[in-house]
Amino acid sequence: MPVPSPRIVKETKRPIEEREPPERKRLRPHDWLSEETRAAFDAALESGDVLRLYMSEKAEEKIRLQAVKEAPRRLEVMGFLLGEVSSWHGVTYATVRDVGTTSLRSSSSKVRFDPEAFPKLFLDLDDSGFDYILVGWYHSHPGHTCFLSKTDLETQRTMFDQPYHTALVIDPLNHDIRAFRLAGDGYEEIPFALFGPEAPDGRKKGRKRRLKVTPVASK
């Protein structure tokens, strides 16, 4: 019997704003970066380049704790990366401020959202507290290192095909984490930075965006 799955039937596109990335003094590398990825991070900061991905410590902690919780059973986890897309000196980058997830159906090598939990997921996204954009997704590879499988790559191509979309993969057993984006027929790793809390600046919160969800039978 086909299992109903949700589809976003209405969305609002916003122009990409010119915004400076988080200050360099607020940036730090993830503790689980490989030597190669750490070298790319250091080189980018030394040159003053704009990274393609900045992630709040709050969002990183949620992802890491979720992955670590299921690591003893070697179960994969997943969720959405919520944030904003900006441009600075001609470079488009994404800022992840929070994550969204719900009940999952997972094993040591596969994971997907529980279809019955989609309504709660979208309600939680609406209550996120800021005018978010889906800037990518994350999932774990417990004990399998960090890469995009054929299934992961297909997911990226069909659902996250914009230049700013990121696939974040975390291995809680090997203490590894990497960020990827599409490149040609495949994908490439991109350096990313974590940033700490912002000082209060008096800006008003953005309006919440409501997503209309309609059940659609999967083929």
Label for each model-derived stretch:
Residues 1-134, 143-219:
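Conserved beta-strand-loop surface patch within small alpha/beta domains used
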